Design a protein with these regions (language model features):
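Extracytoplasmic beta-strand/coil segments of soluble accessory domains associated
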Residues: 139-180, 202
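Short, acidic, small-residue-rich periplasmic hinge/interaction motif at the N-terminus
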Residues: 28, 32, 39-44, 73-77, ...
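Structural signature of outer-membrane beta-barrel domains
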Residues: 113-115, 169, 181, 229, ...
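A beta-strand signature from Gram-negative outer-membrane beta-barrel systems
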Residues: 195-240
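Acidic/polar loop-and-plug regions of large Gram-negative outer-membrane beta-barrel proteins
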Residues: 302-401, 428-486
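Short, acidic Ser/Thr/Gly-rich low-complexity loop/linker segments typical of extracellular
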Residues: 46-57
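Short acidic/polar hinge/loop motifs at secondary-structure boundaries
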Residues: 61-62, 131, 161, 180-208, ...
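Transmembrane beta-barrel wall of Gram-negative outer-membrane proteins
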Residues: 236, 243-274, 279-317, 324-362, ...
Length: 496
């Protein structure tokens, strides 16, 4: 009998050595005392946890003796945290405070369609933007959207365009945080002005056809509203480095301060992008920045400030090539055309799809600068001393908007945004006599190879062309590389 007692004692010893306990309690609203059903309670550093029931109670079983930290969280409330020493069953109650004005949920001043509106629309989430957009222009993520076609055109950074139901960008209202971005003169949208907006995009809604927009914008084709990231409740940041063909290099850095003194929060993103381009001469040299700030004046009264911009310059590829030069698919398509010149097929059938006529080499002895009208300067160094771009785009058009959200009562809310968008920049092109290098005489598209620019020839001709009708000694240029400059400022207030 004595031996049996010893065996039983040894058998049950682990139960006493590893006693299991229960932590229980309630999760309630700190101001009203109401139960917070569904609140999560977690033992930090373990897989143990529980969800609060309808009456706000929770229970976590099989907790070994020891010291632990418990956290409780639920959407719309600030997280709670408590420490507890467990040597038996313990009770831990949480009283959570409402999050200060839900700073992480930016209310956008924009006309967005909902489930019950008779508008065809598609929403693109931030997760989709991060997974599918990469370093492309914003419109490219909409290519899988019904009735939408987007293309990068010649491949230059920011040179994309979008068509909705057959209408081009002049008939599509493009907005950032509810602020219209179409050109005031011709309605076009220059995506190079927003080259880095994809890195700060929270969501995109594409409305197809006439929609709920109550602004004077050209929206017969549709409405595209880009929503940027709000200020974040939690402190943190991220760093991203991207590499690609054509010497592509893109660096992105982001930082959020989190909520400071339950009153304010700041977020900032900066992007640097460079590369020689996939197409010949389609280099890019760009920066992008995004800044957000939010301040809680009082309950139901909030101010937000946002600024976004993308100072950039890039080479363009704007000339169409003979269809047979577009690789195997181009040759196949050309052969299917009854009126296509077969002689051209023989000349262009082995064309280099990466060829671009918007640039050409120039002698290193040429020291001319490029005309430039940005940041108070009139001239700037060329991107590369070994070549000249006929077509180059440069611009910086920041957007700054101040949002005010005011809850008048339970049935009325007032949203007001004051904004400014402006800047300067332009693009290059040629005037006067052309200096080209066709392989043989003939039409430029039917030479044995596409023509190229002869910049050295143009410089020589301009340097030895005394025109006595204008001046007895000075040379008169036969052809010039011009820069067209655009300066604009747009102010506005939207309230509803």
């Amino acid at each position: 009998m004595r031996k049996l007692s010893q065996v039983l004692l040894i058998a049950f010893l682990p139960i006493f050595l590893f006693a299991q306990n229960t932590i229980s309690g309630t999760v309630t609203d700190a101001s009203t005392g109401e139960a917070l059903a569904g609140a999560n309670v977690v033992v930090v550093g373990t897989s143990m946890g529980a969800a609060a029931t309808a009456d706000g109670s929770y229970s976590i079983s099989n907790v070994p003796d020891g010291s632990y930290t418990l956290t409780s969280s639920v959407i719309g409330y600030a997280d709670g945290s408590q420490s507890v020493n467990v040597s038996g069953d313990a009770t831990v109650n949480f009283s959570l405070n409402v999050s200060a004005l839900e700073l992480s949920a930016l209310e956008v001043l924009a006309s967005r369609a909902g489930e019950k509106t008779p508008v065809a629309y598609t929403n693109i989430s931030k997760a989709e933007v991060e997974a599918r957009l990469g370093s492309q222009d914003i419109p490219m993520i909409l290519n899988t959207t019904p009735s939408v076609y987007a293309t990068q055109q010649g491949g230059g950074a920011g040179d994309a365009r979008i068509n909705v139901r057959g209408f081009n960008q002049r008939n599509i209202a493009v907005m950032i945080n509810g602020v219209p971005q179409n050109d005031m003169e011709n309605g076009w949208v220059y995506w190079s002005n927003w080259d880095g907006v994809g890195d700060a995009t929270s969501s995109i809604q594409m409305q197809r056809g006439l929609s709920a927009v109550n602004l004077a914008t050209p929206s017969i084709g549709g409405t595209m509203n880009i929503i940027t990231d709000p200020t974040a409740l939690n402190r943190g940041g991220k760093f991203k480095q991207e590499f690609g063909a054509g010497g592509f290099l893109k660096t992105t850095a982001n930082y959020n301060t989190g909520l400071i003194n339950d009153k304010m929060a700041f977020s900032a993103t900066i992007v640097r992008k460079t590369g020689d381009g996939i197409m010949d001469g389609n280099w890019t040299d760009a920066w992008a920045y995004y800044f957000g700030a939010s301040y809680a004046i009082s309950d139901g009264n909030r101010l937000e400030l946002y600024a976004i911009g993308a100072p950039q310059r890039h080479g363009q590829n704007l000339y169409r090539q003979n269809m047979a030069s577009y690789g195997e698919e181009g040759v196949k398509f050309a052969k299917e055309q009854s009126d296509y010149d077969q002689a051209a097929l023989e000349k262009f059938g082995n064309g280099d799809r990466l060829f671009s006529q918007n640039w050409g080499p120039v002698s290193s002895s040429y020291k001319g600068k490029q005309y430039w009208f940005m940041y108070g300067a009139n001239t700037t160094d060329r991107y590369n001393s070994g070549f000249l771009n006929e077509r180059e785009n440069f611009f910086h058009k920041p957007l700054v908007n101040m949002n005010h959200f005011y809850t008048v009562n339970d049935n009325m809310r007032l949203s007001t945004v004051a904004y400014w968008s402006g800047g300067s920049g332009g693009g290059t092109g040629t005037y006067g006599s052309s200096f080209r290098n066709p392989a043989v005489a003939g039409k430029k598209w039917y030479a044995s190879s596409p023509w190229t620019w002869n910049w050295d020839g143009a410089i020589a001709a301009n340097s030895s062309n005394v025109d006595t009708d204008y001046d007895p000694t000075k040379n008169r240029s036969k052809g010039i590389l011009r820069n067209s400059i655009n300066r604009q400022d747009t102010y506005g207030v939207i309230s509803k």
